[in-house]
A protein has these predicted regions:
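C-terminal/domain-edge helix-coil "capping" segments
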Residues: 1-70, 74, 78-81, 92-103, ...
Length: 114
């Protein structure tokens, strides 16, 4: 209860300064290996650069699904960092390799912010 109350108070405070604040959920693809989980942990802490540094390593993978997922995650990181044109480039790259099921959701979000 205290955590929820604190969240609500914090949200109210932020909204008083930034009325356009919008709560969004995002999706990150990962595989059950140490490096993927490290990147997921960094993304969960909003360390987008740290997460991207790990995902970049997967861009040379022989597995097209892993390359596509890494590109999608980089697109998400760019989107969350406010670089919408770069996010779109990475999402296009991901779609060229292997269009992921939730790609269209991220594309709509990016296009709404351009």
């Amino acid at each position: 209860k205290d955590a929820t109350q604190g969240w609500d108070q914090g949200k109210d405070l932020v909204e008083s300064f930034i009325p356009q604040w919008k709560h969004e959920q995002y999706s990150i693809y990962y595989f059950n290996t140490d490096k993927w989980l490290q990147a997921l942990e960094k993304a969960d802490m909003y360390d987008w650069k740290g997460a991207m540094d790990i995902w970049f390593d997967f861009l040379d993978s022989n597995d097209p699904l892993k390359r596509s997922c890494a590109s999608f995650n980089i697109a998400t990181a760019c989107y969350m960092s406010g670089d919408y044109p770069l996010a779109l480039e990475w999402l296009d790259q991901s779609d060229k390799i292997n269009k992921l099921q939730i790609s269209s959701v991220l594309r709509k979000r990016i296009n709404a912010r351009k």
